[in-house]
Amino acid sequence: MEFWHDTARSRRWLGRLILFMVLLLLPAAVVGLFARPMADDFGYSAATHAVAVQYGFDLPRLLAAAWDTTVHYFNNWQGLYVSGFVLALQPGLFGNRWYGLTFFWVVVPLFACLWGCARLVVRRLDPKVRLLAPALAMLFLFAFVQGMPNPAEGLYWINGAVNYQLYFA
């Protein structure tokens, strides 16, 4: 742990680690840009997509349509709570090319969660060490993304990602 107390040296290594991890995650992000909606994506976002086509980015109408979708699926299907609302606001509302943002929509909250968890553990062990938490979070994120059994459903398909990954975060 002495290494992490030397702030200048640990900042340099943290910068290198972040750059290395970003380079390792870059192929997964590039693949994510080619993701397209499928299956349940169309049903959950039908009402909000209709609003987006008719009115553009009209936030009050989009939120109202997302709320109506949530109420509909809650009453008629499986009792979705928050995920029905989030699924109705998926990135592909304004066109399929925006659906590729799903990867980032999942990975950013996941990284924030892992950073928070690592920060709690590191501060409990040694409150003076501040730069170890982001390093651990990057390592855990890399392991999480690379070790996922089915990345197509967990990172690139909004329905699978929101219902399972986002709540982990």
What are these regions (language model features)?
Residues M1-P27:
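Start-transfer (signal-anchor) and selected internal transmembrane alpha helices
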Residues W13-L17, F74, P127-M138:
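Membrane-interfacial loop-to-transmembrane alpha-helix junctions, especially the N-terminal start
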Residues M21-A29, F111, W115, L136-Q146:
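Hydrophobic core of alpha-helical transmembrane segments in multi-pass integral membrane proteins
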Residues V31-V53, D58-L63, F74-V86:
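Extracytoplasmic catalytic/substrate-binding loops of multi-pass membrane glycan-assembly enzymes
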Residues T69-F104:
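Short hydrophobic/aromatic helix or loop-helix immediately within or flanking a transmembrane segment
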Residues L101-C113, A161-A169:
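Membrane-embedded alpha-helical segments of multi-pass membrane proteins
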Residues W105-K128:
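Transmembrane-helix motifs of polytopic, lipid-linked glycan transferases
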Residues L132-A133, F140-A169:
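Membrane-interface micro-motifs in multi-pass membrane enzymes
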